[in-house]
Amino acid sequence: MGKKGGKKRQHRESALLGALATQDESRLQVRRTPKLYIGGAFPRSESGRTDVLSLARGGSANIARASRKDLREAVKVARAAAPGWASRNASLRGQIMYRVAELMEGRAAQFRDDLVAHGYGKSDAADEVAASIDRLVWFAGWPDKLPAVLGGTNPVASSHFVFTIPEPTGVVAIVAPESSPLLGLVTRLAGVLAGGNVAILLASEGAPLPSVTLAETLAVSDVPAGVVNILTGRRAELMPHLSRHADIDGIDLWGCPDELLIDAERGAAEHVARIARRPHGEKDRASAFTGERGERIDGMTAFLEMKSVWHPIGS
């Protein structure tokens, strides 16, 4: 009876596995629908437009194509979130950024798949994901150290104590690097957040999937809604409006294409926005973000204002 019972059980298990395999082959896979990330939500573009992006290993993805109105909405929610993020304890901001790194570690396979879909080899993709997580941890250690490193007490001739402290610029727009769609993206974004700024990120046009996955990661992290907003779409369409928006305080133009760079700088100058850009003559290269080249304090100081406070000395 024991042998017969065992054979019957094996037969039932084989039949069940076969049925599950057949079911798996017959079901339709739930396809990913990448959207914008604005104010902690995932809206489609108000225009309803999408761009069809061909993937390196076959297949395609429908990427939301942000409009001028989507950009205005992102600026609106970023401005509303700016005071709360800037006023948070600096140590807490660092802990929140570290939590994002933890969540990225848990989604490492998804980030790797995104990079492979854009033409990376599996080994190179794994290396970039690991480096991106490490980079975020590096920046997460800085928020509570910036006042000590950059601030100080200034000697003056009058009877005053003079203290200088760094303060965030406010709303910063970031044009993500095309050359490094994850590591470059994390490097530029983390520097802005560490300084207490809020961000509107214009994702890589050619490789937007890592930005989409980062948005999905931020949505379940402790980063408050509106602190990071991510738009996908066409840079030639969005850059003129982004650079000239009067409620954007700073623009990181590292990933801006050469043909759009001069117009973007002119647009920023019209409302005196701070800008950061790659050095003159330097191309948007992935090597700029690898190793110690990406671990630079100027990624934070580019969007910090130095405020001096004068306090009279009593007699």
Predicted regions and their residues:
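Short, structured beta/alpha segment
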Residues: K3-A117, W310
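C-terminal segments
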Residues: K3-A21, E25-S26, D134-V149, F163, ...
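Conserved small-residue-rich beta-alpha loop and adjacent elements
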Residues: A56, G141-P224
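Residue-level signal for inorganic ion chemistry
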Residues: R57, R93, G196, V228, ...
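Long amphipathic alpha-helix in the N-terminal Rossmann-like dinucleotide-binding domain
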Residues: R72-K76, G84, G94-A109, G119-V149, ...
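Short acidic active-site motifs
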Residues: D124, H160, E237-L238, L260
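Hydrophobic/aromatic ligand-binding patch that stacks against planar heteroaromatic rings
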Residues: A190-L193, H241, G267
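A charged, well-structured terminal subsegment
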Residues: T232-W254
